[in-house]
Amino acid sequence: MSRLKINLDAIERDGASATEGFCADGVRIGSLLVSSEGVRDNQGNLCVLSLSDLEVVPETEGGFLGKGSSGSVRRAVHRGSNKVVALKEIKVTGQTHINEIRRELETLHAGDFATPYLVSFYGAFAHEGSVFIAMEAMDGSLHELYKPVPPPVLACITRLMLKGLTYLHRNRHLIHRDLKPSNVLYNSRTGDIKISDFGVSSNLECTKADAHSFVGTVTYMSPERLRGEHYSYGADIWSLGLVVAELAVGVCPYAGLRGGSSEARFWALLQHLNGDGTALELPPEMDSDLADFISACVVKSPDRRPTCTELLRHPFIVRYTGAAPEAEAKPFSTTTPTVLAPGGLSSLLNRASPAAGSALPLASEGGTPKATSPSPAPVSPLTLSCPLERHDGETDADIADRTVVARWIHAVMKRAVLHKARGHGREELHQEPLAAVSASVATDSGEGGGAAGVSAASLDNGQAAQHREFRAERNLDGHSGDGGSAPVEEDCTAGVRSLTCDDLRWTSTGEPSVNLDDELNRLLF
């Protein structure tokens, strides 16, 4: 059976072709034709995916996930497998959008199955002037995550982000150019941390090349980019430092620039970064290794910033995650990524279908995507008594990191539900449970001794105790318990209300309500 293999060289070579754009059969992107039936390459191979394969979840039922660099992202359900996917729509109105779609398809397809640190790509199709890209659905972004994140957990999140950046820089020779909390996604059940939104990424022909275009989100841009100078991989390192700082402190690093007009705030930021002082003032009580890590990333001179490989050896990462520094220096596998069969999304998702006979109603043919599908059932809490599935190429340290992240998110979600049920305010939640959760995670992750020795199985007793305590607290509050069903160790989700992303978002500090990034981008572009 023939397989679709996207010719990345042909895409890059034909990128400036005059034939790109709308045609009778769809939208031509380099050597690819994106039609209503899916993606066809120049050899005639077709990766099948169409609107009729999907049902878009209504916005009133949590269907709207957010906006990318130039398109909206909605939740959809693949009717053949009942699996939830993220469906990104990019309205094609010019060459800029053609370029973005090319970058998305190239990066997602090349990274799919080659690394677990980028969101998976399922397929694409064209419909009524837009290109829709189906990707792996995640639970949320770091923008929505409870903040501040305790250092032991933050180190695990940061290490997983670094693994994704290492793949982009070393294997794909790509600068992401828009790394920010909303472009780093998490899965609360598995602890996966994945980089997304490659619409403004830039390819470097060799490791010494640099770029010069001005795209991305202004408040996470490095000084050399703000000045319009040439830049390289160090620009992503700067953005990473700001993301880590935001997770550590709980607010956008340059939130204080919200006063005045958009133009005044932009020039204030540029003046600050061009000054002689440090780029970022960190709280004196911050963990010393964490502060040193952030400071190393946000050095104003790009030549003095460390690489991803060097940061993976930083004391902040090694201390809390226990990952062997020499192991991180090994290059990623350069094997050819798995390619999709002609069945496309349908064949890929049906292999992992959670249940048979759960197909959804047919999507309507023609017209705009109909938001008529019922919202997918809430995902039950993470069951840490079962070891997390190992991704291809993962080490024990990777699994340990994901376990710590998943457990922390799960603990915060449970406390949020409990406080919400008791009628406590958001401020009370921020004052009390974080310290307890942080202490618990720090102990279990082996603060000072590394988290590499932490396995999912080793968390069984503690997790079971947490669920027993949580159920007891719910009973005291007049909520139903587990009904005395299966033992906790065998089913630690029994009797516990299903937790959804909304439970976690309720506790989110988030970025400032005034979106400085959007205002500055409107000013500049």
Curated annotation (Swiss-Prot):
A Pfam short name: Pkinase
Q: Where is the Protein kinase domain?
A: 59-317
State the EC number(s). Answer: 2.7.12.2
Q: Which UniProt keywords apply?
A: ATP-binding, Kinase, Magnesium, Metal-binding, Nucleotide-binding, Serine/threonine-protein kinase, Transferase, Tyrosine-protein kinase
Q: Which CDD domains match?
A: PKc_MAPKK_plant_like
* Cofactor note (record): Mn(2+) was used in the in vitro kinase assay but Mg(2+) is likely to be the in vivo cofactor.
- Report the SMART domains cross-referenced here: S_TKc
Q: Which residues cross the membrane?
A: none
Q: Name one GO biological process term.
A: MAPK cascade
Question: What InterPro entries does this protein's entry cite?
Answer: Kinase-like_dom_sf, Prot_kinase_dom, Protein_kinase_ATP_BS, Ser/Thr_kinase_AS
Region of interest (Disordered), residue spans: 358-392, 438-468
What is its cofactor?
Answer: Mg(2+)
User: What segments bear the compositional bias annotation Low complexity?
Assistant: 358-367
Q: Which reaction does it catalyse?
A: L-tyrosyl-[protein] + ATP = O-phospho-L-tyrosyl-[protein] + ADP + H(+); L-seryl-[protein] + ATP = O-phospho-L-seryl-[protein] + ADP + H(+); L-threonyl-[protein] + ATP = O-phospho-L-threonyl-[protein] + ADP + H(+)
Active site per the UniProt annotation:
D178
- Report the GO molecular function annotations: ATP binding; MAP kinase kinase activity; metal ion binding; protein serine kinase activity; protein serine/threonine kinase activator activity; protein serine/threonine kinase activity; protein tyrosine kinase activity
Main EC class the enzyme belongs to: transferase
UniProt function note: Protein kinase which phosphorylates and activates MPK4 in vitro.
Name assigned to this protein: Mitogen-activated protein kinase kinase 5
